[in-house]
Each structure stands twice: as structure tokens, then as C-alpha cells.
Amino acid sequence: MVNRINCDLGNDLGNLLHRTLTMIEKYCDGIVPDHEGLLSTEGEELVGRSKKLNDQVDHAMSNLQFSKALESIWDYIGLVNKYVEISKPWVLAKELSTKNKLNEVLYNLAESIRIISLFILPFMPNVAAEMHKQLGLSPDEESAGNNITWGGMRPGTKVCKGTPIFRKFEYSAEN
């Protein structure tokens, strides 16, 4: 259980949020950049998978298969983490010529996290609310909760990176 909390929640989701907000703060002065309609192959995959995720989660929830819904959400989180590694925004930030690509990547990350937060809302409402807050979304946007379509993250939104949303648990076996 401790390992699952540390890996799935802390490493996969918590680090994704924290890394993304840190990069938006560092490279875009804390403002979600305008993506100017650009979409790379990897970006198109994120959009396509988010639509597929919507169908998968809807089907699982309709059939009361909550663990299947969570599995689908975590598969998407894994894809977004892979997107970070493939896109290497920290490398893109070093060259002025790749600024548009950097903006696309950071927008896609913020939008993916917004969508993830909406999917986890029924399972972890407090975590989803904190993610919305750190993404700079207003309570109205947070309660709108049904806007799971790609493109709901408004460029120009000021992010508010807080403390990591999950703390690491230590396990000690007593003799």
C-alpha cells in the first residue's frame, strides 16, 4: 500500500503536476503559454488518447468498474509522463528557435493535467481541487467539471504552484 501511494500518487501524478508547474514558472513566468494551434505528432497522441480516455472512463463508471476507470486514468498519466521525457522541455527552453515548440509542450502538459484532474474528481475530490487551484483555475471552472474536451485550459492562466500534493510515506517494519 505504501509503495502504491508513493509510486502511483506521488511519483506518477504528483511529480507530473509539480514538474509541469515548475517549468511553466521557470520558462513562461508562471503563465500557461499560447500554443498557437500547433500540434506535433506526440501532441496529437495526447489529444487522441484523452478522447479515448473519456470513453473508457465513462464506460467503466457506467458499469461500476471503478478500478478499471482508475487503471485507464493511470495509463493516461503514464503517457503524459512519457511525453515529458520525449519532448524534453528543459532542452527546448535553451534555444530561442524552439520557443513555439516549448509553448506547445507546456500547454499540452497543463491541459493534460487539467483533464486528469477532472477524471480523478469522483475518486479524490480534495486532490482534484488542489490540482485545479495550482493550475490557476477558478472555482467556476472547477465545478464545471464536465469540460473534459481538449482545449479547455486557457492560455494566459497564471499557475499557482504550491507544495507537492502527495507526501512520500516511509514504511518501517518492526522486528
Q: Can you name each region flagged by the protein language model?
A:
Residues M1-L9, K52-E71:
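Extended, non-catalytic structural segments that build the interaction scaffolds
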Residues M1-L39, S138-I165, F169-S172:
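Catalytic adenosine-cofactor/nucleotide-binding cores of aminoacyl-tRNA synthetases and other
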Residues G10, G14, V47, K51, ...:
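Generic structural concept
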Residues L17-V57, I77, N81-T98:
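Conserved, charged catalytic cores of large soluble enzymes
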Residues H59, N63-Q65, W74-N175:
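Basic, alpha-helical terminal appendages of large translation-related enzymes
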Residues N3, G10, L39, G43-V47, ...:
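Short, surface-exposed loop/turn motifs that are enriched in glycine and acidic residues
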